[in-house]
Amino acid sequence: MSTPLSLQALAKKILATQHISKNHYFILKYCGLWWHGAPIMFSTNEDNQLMIKSAIFKDGLELNLALMKAVQENNYDLIELFTEWGADINSSLVTVNTEHTWNFCRELGAKILNEMDIVQIFYKIHRIKTSSNIILCHKLLSNNPLFQNIEELKIIICCFLEKISINFILNEITLNEMLARLWYSMAVRYHLTEAIQYFYQRYRHFKDWRLICGLSFNNVSDLHEIYHIKKVDMNIDEMMYLACMRDSNFLTIFYCFVLGANINRAMVTSVKNFYTNNLFFCIDLGANAFEESLELAKQKNHDILVEILSFKDFYNSNVSLLSLKTTDPEKINALLKNYRSKNIMRYKKLCPKIIRWARFII
């Protein structure tokens, strides 16, 4: 059970949730609601997670991460304040750098961290989808000795990275590189422009990684920037393969298609991965590798795909999709914003058993 807030801490918490005129900033300074020359704001995000905002963290930090930053700065007032607001005081020991601050945090209840504690802290702080949070996670956790030799943490990060079509061998890179690639991929996945630019400037040798993440996470805007503007080169059919590694990646599949990637290969890849939405999208774009796809579906015992492919004579390409030959991200987004495959509609009419398979198809 959490400790009740003191009246003073509660008053500060309420004040930090209000919009305060610049004329009254002196009140915030007096109350200690001031950080890096600007007010501290307290809020919750869409997942009901506690967030701290300030001038240099304008889109928000997870509360425990804010505590870790305050500890690194040896800011005792904020350490106490963030702890009273609900931050886990144990997380303070991740960034403590002086004996006095160590003792201060211990007096507030911080306990010596074991490996499981460190893994739990990582879970708490790393999922917040803001540029401020991702960049600060990278700064505070990179080269942090507490994180270096925890096998479970490495396994967690490896499992995430393996879901992307990585172009490196996980066992041959350091934990710091794993973490950097993790943060970078999250920035691309959630369209966090500030974080993307931060990692691009810091890790220019990761250009291919940014391209891979753009393809994997259906971020056509960033894909266009890194491929067309930054001139990162990759075989177009390899790019299409990467785009097909997640279902419903319509934006990046279309982008690769316009560049000239083989749509029949994409169709076969979709069958191989059992991605029905990608399969229908490829058919909409004119793919006709039905015989090869049907044989593959039979080999893999994908009965639903065998059934879908058996109606090949009833499917047609989508003229409205084929009429737009552009790699402009805005136009692609507009084209596919409300996309629904007409061939799926045809299949539903032809196949009375569709209800059994509805969960597989958009």
From Swiss-Prot:
One GO term (biological process): taxis
Q: Which InterPro entries match?
A: ASFV_MGF360
A Pfam family this protein belongs to?
ASFV_360
TM annotation in the entry? none
Q: Which domain of life is it from?
A: Viruses
Which family is this protein grouped under?
Belongs to the asfivirus MGF 360 family.
What function is annotated for this protein?
Plays a role in virus cell tropism, and may be required for efficient virus replication in macrophages.
**What protein name is recorded for this chain?**
Protein MGF 360-2L
Q: Identify the species of origin.
A: African swine fever virus (strain Badajoz 1971 Vero-adapted) (Ba71V)
